[in-house]
């Protein structure tokens, strides 16, 4: 299990062309990697999504997030993840009474620098987003959390997006809202 500290910002299309260069210069040696993720969120009928199955290239990962409610637009989650083979994963969970509730597709670019992941992605149905995520140990203390929050704020400043509001909602909630 790991604790992730993440923030995301909706990006205006006029910034999309220049942002990859800004991110690459800021992160130095971190290579830009294409990213394409397909997520299916599962839950019980009439209930909230309980977990997701993500296909990222040839990798399939099941993730459950224990979410911490915050008012500052930053997500702090403890994640439980495990890798599976694609074969019967859908059939397995539907046999337990879970159904697919929401689908999400993200396409874009990713940079990694140690425990930091930065993604500039287009989320189908929602638009373009800059995501920044720091992974901490699941037993990270308040000081480590505060340092992570400060680092994310500094990165937003260096990327030139500090004045843009943080999007505190989860993508699956945003997608569910537009389906209503």
Where are these regions (language model features)?
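A short, polar/proline- and glycine-enriched secondary-structure boundary/capping micro-motif
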Residues: 72-78, 131, 142-145
């Amino acid at each position: 299990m790991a604790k992730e500290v993440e923030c995301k910002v909706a990006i205006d299309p006029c910034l999309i062309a220049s942002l990859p260069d800004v991110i690459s210069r800021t992160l130095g040696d971190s290579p830009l990697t294409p990213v394409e993720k397909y997520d299916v969120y599962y839950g019980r009928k009439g209930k909230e999504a309980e977990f997701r199955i993500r296909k990222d290239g040839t990798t399939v990962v099941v993730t459950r997030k224990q979410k911490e409610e915050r008012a500052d637009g930053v997500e702090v989650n403890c994640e439980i993840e495990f890798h599976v083979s694609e074969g019967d994963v859908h059939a397995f969970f539907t046999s337990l009474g879970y159904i697919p509730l929401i689908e999400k597709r993200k396409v874009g670019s990713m940079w990694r620098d140690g425990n930091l992941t930065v993604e500039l992605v287009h989320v189908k149905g929602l638009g373009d987003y800059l995501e920044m995520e720091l992974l901490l140990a699941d037993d990270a203390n308040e000081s480590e959390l505060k340092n992570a929050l400060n680092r994310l704020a500094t990165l937003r400043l260096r990327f030139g997006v500090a004045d843009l509001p943080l999007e505190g909602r989860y993508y699956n909630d945003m997608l569910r809202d537009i389906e209503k």
